[in-house]
């Protein structure tokens, strides 16, 4: 089936929750996450929530980049280029609705990030600051704490963490 998003919003990445009944879309230009219920029989998507990825007070240019869910299906994170942050949300286990945890500073232009398979760490690439930052994920609250910042070569643009 065809999925439409608001004109000009720029759907960038879609990710399924671990149960496969909710799909989340990061919109690059609107800086929102749109949550859709997935009808597993028909394959249709029905939007049920749109939530901003930016603080209300932020008025500068920013674009969404990446989106991931922890392996325990409790937390969703998305990256903001311009605001230079990772936004975190809790995922309601029953409804799939998102609730804001907070905004966590990153290097400049966090184009890509990923979460380790155990759901303990998030690693973000600062494409303009030329660095990787690792964060510990609080398993109870979803808050991110910086563990280490590592300089890289020019413009790191993808973070992939293999299974172990």
Label for each model-derived stretch:
Residues 1-3, 44-53, 98-105, 144-152:
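Beta-propeller fold detector
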Residues 5-21, 53-73, 106-121, 152-164:
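Beta-rich, blade/repeat-based domains predominating
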Residues 17, 25-28, 78-81, 124-127:
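Conserved beta-strand positions in repeat-built beta-propeller and related beta-rich domains
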Residues 26-37, 45-76:
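Oxyanion-binding "anion nests"
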Residues 31-33, 84-86, 131-132:
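Structural signal for beta-propeller blades
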Residues 36-44, 89-96, 135-142:
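Short loop/turn segments immediately following beta-strands, especially the blade-tip
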Residues 65, 69-109:
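C-terminal structural cap/anchor segments
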Residues 127-136, 145-164:
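Blade-level signature of beta-propeller repeat domains, shared across WD40, Kelch, NHL, RCC1
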